[in-house]
Amino acid sequence: MLWLDQYRPKTLASLDYHKQLSERLISLSSTNEFPHLLVYGPSGAGKKTRVVAILRELYGPGSEKLKIDQRTFLTPSSKKLQINIVSSLHHLEITPSDVGNYDRVIMQELLKDVAQSAQVDLQAKKIFKVVVINVADELTRDAQAALRRTMEKYSNNIRLILIANSTSKIIEPIRSRTLMVRVAAPTPEEIILVMSKILTAQGLEAPDSLLNNIANNCDRNLRKAILLLETVHAKSPGNKQLIDTGAQLPLPDWQTFIQQVGDSMLQEQSPARILAVRSMLYDLLSHCIPPTTILKELLSFFLSKVDTKLHPYLIQAAANYEHRTRMGNKSIFHLEAFVAYFMKVYAMLQLGMELPSY
């Protein structure tokens, strides 16, 4: 088992940072007027861990007895949609954005079924069920409108906990009907504290320089920090003392692969190279790397490699194609369009040609 899962806190009281927030959530969970929640913050800040701890606070250990089901829904055009549902007797966890623009169907049918069914466990502390919606900021506006109607109609039977990276894409009617809980990214000091506790539990030691290096290069993402720490340990599994070699921390395989895609685009700009890059992009998508993440990583890579004259063009193009990937179904088309655009403006700059207006 990964350290990330092995040492994940299970209760609000055992969380290592944002103590005031934990106390407030404990207080909320003890009342019968538990509200709908919108839990937001950057990746790796601890949103999901806190939501799982809230469920335990509401229902006790029974919320951890999970099963995974696959359910099929039918769209008005008779297209079949399949979605995985993680559930206990007390709650459901779904990611409707997995089905793209059909997420409205999931929201309408599933939430209606849950809201109209009674609580199965008669000994449960709360009479309502909780529905956890992951990546809520990726929901389409139609799905969010359906969600708003459900919140109004079935508020006695269900409570919604929405998890999002940002509130900017959540419509105002939902924001106004939820208690917004911001989970800020941990500070480097808090990340070092968590890593030190894990090392102590493992019977390991590490120099301060290594912990500082990880904490300062993990983008304040605790998940990434713990994975990096375990990666360092895996390179010398027999040693009780982790060694700081002073070398650059290893990047995840997918991130290294995206950099290889960027290098390939810098080396040659041609139709043949676009086809080669397209194949590499397919590999990333097939390994569940989100298209928006691919765009952001490519943009970050190019901004560090190319002339600053190109920066506004690339930023504008990345924003444009990110929007298109969210609106459409075939993300590979928009990724490939960004690749072609980059090759065009980069080749024009190399040849000394006048760049187009953006």
UniProtKB/Swiss-Prot annotation:
SUPFAM superfamilies: P-loop containing nucleoside triphosphate hydrolases, post-AAA+ oligomerization domain-like
Family note: Belongs to the activator 1 small subunits family.
Gene Ontology process terms (BP): DNA repair; DNA strand elongation involved in mitotic DNA replication; DNA-templated DNA replication; UV-damage excision repair
The encoding gene: rfc5
Gene3D superfamilies per the UniProt record, alphabetical: 1.10.8.60, 1.20.272.10, P-loop containing nucleotide triphosphate hydrolases
Subunit architecture: Heteropentamer of subunits rfc1, rfc2, rfc3, rfc4 and rfc5 that forms a complex (RFC) with PCNA in the presence of ATP. Two other complexes exist where rfc1 can be replaced by either ctf18 or elg1 to form the ctf18-RFC or the elg1-RFC complexes respectively.
Protein name: Replication factor C subunit 5
Main location (coarse class): nucleus
One Gene Ontology term of the molecular function aspect: DNA clamp unloader activity
Keyword Nucleus: yes
Alphabetically ordered keywords of this record: DNA replication, DNA-binding, Nucleus
Role description: The elongation of primed DNA templates by DNA polymerase delta and epsilon requires the action of the accessory proteins PCNA and activator 1.
Subcellular location: Nucleus
Lyase keyword on record: no
A GO term from the CC aspect: cytosol
